[in-house]
Amino acid sequence: MQEPKNSQTLHDVANGASDLEGPLAWVGMEDIALPFRLANSAVNGRASAGVSLDATSARGIHMSRLYLALEALEHEEVTLSGLGAVLQRFLASHDGLARTAFLDLSGDVLIKRPALISPRAGWKAYPCALRCRQDTQGMQAVLEVTIGYSSTCPCSAALARQSIQQAFDEDFTDMPISHEAVRTWLGSEQGILATPHSQRSQAHLSLRLADDLETLPVTALIDTVEDALGTALQTAVKRVDEQAFALANGQNLMFCEDAARRVRHALQARDEVQGFRVRIVHAESLHAHDAVAHAEWNWTPNSP
């Protein structure tokens, strides 16, 4: 398509002066469609791009320059150096107007996960976001990841065991006890008279990354947290996998406080992480509300 011929220079009102003066902390665009790659996964992503408007008399910024700078990320594996180059381009294209640049990327990372025992496997989606900022102090990057897992209430498990003990006492009082009789009883519905309540839970991670990383260790960090919790959500399973999952839940009884401490200790051991904020959410099946715990380490509220 040919551009319309026009011998006159098109006027850009953004270059004009504002009637009301004053700096603006952030000006830009949100929810921009942008395909990129993260953790070797193609992501149908979204981007937010902006800069501060520090020239108090300037009417506005050049949003098209931010939009065009994002082309460098299309279909490419996201790296901190690549994000830094885009942020520098944001600032270079707004020389004299802006001192701080911002870039957020978000989308689901797909990772294929094997079953616990059988050869089956399936895909899991991990919502991820990268929130980056470039200013006179340098570049800061925060990786956000949401990880789903299962949690079984320790209190409920203890009450369930007590109920089973009481039922055992009632059924075997004044009776000779044989190994076969007990084994049969344990395999009956009476032997599992009560079950502890469990819930699908989430760990929301905000991780301040070391600025010298060549690659983003998204999968490794997810693996670290899932290993610490011990009850990662499954994909395709057979009965043998479901049995193994039940065993994992029984061996990893967790209040939200327990889960938060497990994740905290696991992340503190990762050199790639310089600080973090963790939000643990157990969507209670007993109550209509959620049980929540937060953990922080070397975290500042003004992280991007």
Curated annotation (Swiss-Prot):
<comment type="function">
    <text>Converts GTP to 7,8-dihydroneopterin triphosphate.</text>
</comment>
<comment type="similarity">
    <text>Belongs to the GTP cyclohydrolase IV family.</text>
</comment>
<dbReference type="Pfam" id="PF02649">
    <property type="entry name" value="GCHY-1"/>
</dbReference>
<dbReference type="InterPro" id="IPR022838">
    <property type="entry name" value="GTP_cyclohydrolase_FolE2"/>
</dbReference>
<feature type="site" description="May be catalytically important">
    <location>
        <position position="153"/>
    </location>
</feature>
<protein>
    <recommendedName>
        <fullName>GTP cyclohydrolase FolE2</fullName>
        <ecNumber>3.5.4.16</ecNumber>
    </recommendedName>
</protein>
<dbReference type="GO" id="GO:0003934">
    <property type="term" value="F:GTP cyclohydrolase I activity"/>
</dbReference>
<dbReference type="GO" id="GO:0046654">
    <property type="term" value="P:tetrahydrofolate biosynthetic process"/>
</dbReference>
<dbReference type="InterPro" id="IPR003801">
    <property type="entry name" value="GTP_cyclohydrolase_FolE2/MptA"/>
</dbReference>
<keyword id="KW-0378">Hydrolase</keyword>
<comment type="pathway">
    <text>Cofactor biosynthesis; 7,8-dihydroneopterin triphosphate biosynthesis; 7,8-dihydroneopterin triphosphate from GTP: step 1/1.</text>
</comment>
